[in-house]
Amino acid sequence: MNYSRNRAIVFAIVHSNMPLNKASIKFGLSTRQIRRIISKYKKEGAESLLPVSRASKTHANAIQEDIIQRIIILREQLTTGGWDAGAKTIHTYLLKELEPSKVPSISTIWRILQRSGKIIPEPKKRPKTSYIRFQADYPNETWQSDFTHWTISNSEDIEITTWIDDNSRYILNVKAYKTTTVHTIIETFLDSAYKNGLPTSILTDNGLVYTTRLSGGKKRNNQPNSFEQLLDNLGIKAKHGRPAHPTTQGKIERYHQTLKRWLKAQPVAKTIEELNLLLQDFQTLYNQTRPHQSLNNITPTRSLH
């Protein structure tokens, strides 16, 4: 079963209302085959689209007990560490540990986790196929930036600023500040550029630390801020998401979810200095160790280089 093709079929028919006969021609399948894919998707959700290993043709109850236990342990270790712990991620880790012929399929791993009570099926959950994704074609084509809030042990609100490469998902810079300012953005941008070269463009929201283009009401005659002037001097194109459309910066929004899940699994930082040490550890693990599903399960470091 071709997972990417089946995702495209579901997106085309369920979410874009493509006629069945047109889908049959486009994807090279009979209408009966397409109906079967859609029917299974509606009954079982996105997991029904996962590939089934042709090598083993085995079910979850036919897998060796030691492999089942390793799957459960990996799930617990990844969850405790604050990392993604789905069937795809576990499958990637198993491929590093075992001979490929001994690794269960993603769908079998999912069923093992379900049977052990580690996950609950969500057939009505919106599938990832329903999101239209954009990705830069090469590293340093586009960088994304945003900041998010985090609380340290004394209840002080801290802001974490990040720059990521859109193509490779590589974290270029992540640092905590008491307040994110235009100076903060310039400092982190230049530090990223010093280590990785300059990007062709950047993509951010419309926060005033990034742009003044929407400030000043209807007149909008505001002068560009110092960060915008820097970009202009360097010949770097600034792109910004539409107001009330946060999905434009979807990659960095999902990154924030990963970051916060990981931070919650760590000892609570007492100071901003301790938080920045944690962020350095996170950056290393995220870039060099964690497989990224959107990168065909390689790390951002491998994708960048």
Regions found by a protein language model. Give the residues of each.
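Basic, flexible linker segments flanking DNA-binding modules
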Residues: 48-142, 222-228, 299-305
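Residues in the recognition helix of alpha-helical DNA-binding motifs
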Residues: 36-40, 108-116, 282
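Acidic/histidine-rich, metal-coordinating catalytic segments
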Residues: 194-219, 242-244, 299-301
